Amino acid sequence: MATAYHNLSDYDFNSVPNAENMRFGIVVSEWNNNITGPLLEGAISTLKKHGAKDKNILVQTVPGSFELTFGSAQMIKSGKVDAVIAIGCVVRGDTPHFDYVCAGTTQGIAQLNAEGDIPVIYGLITTNTMQQAEDRAGGRLGNKGDECAITAIKMLDFKEKLQKTQIF
């Protein structure tokens, strides 16, 4: 989706379907909340801009990014959502912890997508510096939360269109 120095909030508003009848779950990491907070705000704002109702947006927090997979799985099992947006931020440090958390979270979310009927949108920012994270959480490169919300809407629209398609 995003490329180097691409503004994550730039998109054609009219290309995004109406989300009025869609239900969204957002699982957000408490760790690095100075980043995940603005990402969450961006996602919610964008969902609402495209017709999502407050009552159809369920937000739950988890302690860290590694827990996003479990939180997303539980949200899916609840039956209360049509799509899940997983939001987190991991900034590289001096130990291999960054690599383990990023790989585990990425693999977990990929597995949920491969095995399930509910799209789980990957909103994990993985950066080398806090400045890079800030740039992607409402800074000079836009807000990845916007991008995640749009992706969730488009994936639900994709799923709905596919279910209605008849091939003979």
UniProtKB/Swiss-Prot annotation:
Short name of one Pfam family: DMRL_synthase
Catalyzed reactions: (2S)-2-hydroxy-3-oxobutyl phosphate + 5-amino-6-(D-ribitylamino)uracil = 6,7-dimethyl-8-(1-D-ribityl)lumazine + phosphate + 2 H2O + H(+)
Keyword match Transferase: yes
Pathway terms, separated by semicolons: Cofactor biosynthesis; riboflavin biosynthesis; riboflavin from 2-hydroxy-3-oxobutyl phosphate and 5-amino-6-(D-ribitylamino)uracil: step 1/2
Class in the EC hierarchy, top level: transferase
EC number assigned by the record: 2.5.1.78
GO biological process, one term: riboflavin biosynthetic process
Coiled coil: none
GO molecular function terms listed in the Swiss-Prot or TrEMBL record: 6,7-dimethyl-8-ribityllumazine synthase activity
Chain positions recorded as (2S)-2-hydroxy-3-oxobutyl phosphate binding sites: D94, T95, R136
UniProt-annotated catalytic positions: H97
Keywords: Riboflavin biosynthesis, Transferase
Keyword Transferase: yes
Gene Ontology CC, one term: cytosol
Function noted in UniProt: Catalyzes the formation of 6,7-dimethyl-8-ribityllumazine by condensation of 5-amino-6-(D-ribitylamino)uracil with 3,4-dihydroxy-2-butanone 4-phosphate. This is the penultimate step in the biosynthesis of riboflavin.
HAMAP family: Lumazine_synth
Family: Belongs to the DMRL synthase family.
Full protein name: 6,7-dimethyl-8-ribityllumazine synthase
Species in which this protein is naturally found: Phocaeicola vulgatus (strain ATCC 8482 / DSM 1447 / JCM 5826 / CCUG 4940 / NBRC 14291 / NCTC 11154) (Bacteroides vulgatus)
